[in-house]
Amino acid sequence: GINTNEDNVSVTTINGGTLQINAGLGAEGDGIDSNGYLVINGGNVYATACEQGGDAGLDATLDIQLNGGFVVGLGNMSDTLSTDSQQEYMVFTFASTLPAESEVVLSDTEGASVLSFTTAKAGQILLFSAPNLARNVDYTPTVDGVTQQYTGNQAVGFGGGAPGEMDG
């Protein structure tokens, strides 16, 4: 994974490009781990944590801001996202762990896919952010064609306000 490790000082900023991170080939590891701030302003970011521990696709000690880009984080833990984020985001905690090589699709109420990817590793918590996410729209996650039950953070969030509820 990517680790910036000067405690409470580091600022990891992603402004563009494509990052595909498959972390923790050993016993642990977050996808992207900033011991300060993590700011994503653009690009395509796919961050998968180690499947063996309590690691996150995106992890920051102080704050995570999602301001743009297409972002997918998969792991077994999730850090709180900043209310200063400028882009919608969703965090799903699934009822059971998604196996590696699972096809994940997130669809809106019209059946249009807003996310489609195959997991590199197993994980239970999925974070997703993209410019085409909308507030007050119900999204349905499916894994290998089966609609998933999820708990916990069932929300579309956006900086500057409380997250909107999602049906699940």
Q: Which sequence ranges carry the predicted segments?
A:
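A composition-driven surface/loop motif
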Residues: G1-G168
